[in-house]
């Protein structure tokens, strides 16, 4: 039996001979860290849409993935309502955005998950979305409804075993996208976002390595900013953010507040460094047509056309 001291000594000997854990864990140990393994890829475009379950969008995708169990062409899954009555999955009658949607909050998402049972979607709608038809939590779309998404799923790699970084709403998961951490944020509460990750964001790394990037927005940022600031937490957020901005660069608050809710502002204290990288969607299309896109493009759609 190898003792703890012997194991540590063995690891040190391995590291001295170039076989340390980091070296062994690399997929191509013979290449230096950071070597370009796919040089033919010159541009990366990232589009992050709204929160949906796999089954909700692609559960009826035949031949790929682990979607809905089907009997005679109809999904068989059920969830109980508050009275214990089983509620079957329902084909959504329309792709039009509903005025009310099932909540994606931390609390609601954990009710839906139900300790791994994934049978709390009706209960979540009943408990967290007053006035919402509880059946909305059991709706799904088919290829006839979403031909573009199904076409993508059939043509390109599809992550059929992918799980969100945070079992919760938009802001924490978009923070994970750009920083690998939500910094403790679990809900869409703007006044809890006046912070910055200790290791920075992907934008900091792109700047450090001289890699070109741009964040394109689909909706004039001033309108998005007003929508964010006008909800229940908005005034508190505005006061905190305004004070922080005034302390950083007097007179710049108006400029930065006009560019809220692009991906780069999920950590607002870093937005100052990103202002020159923000651009309207029209410039994305123009750059794409000319073959002049930056190495990394983040695309934020028009959030008035919500896809929740």
Model-inferred region functions:
Residues 1-308:
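N-terminal pro-sequences and low-complexity stem/linker regions of secreted or lumenal proteins
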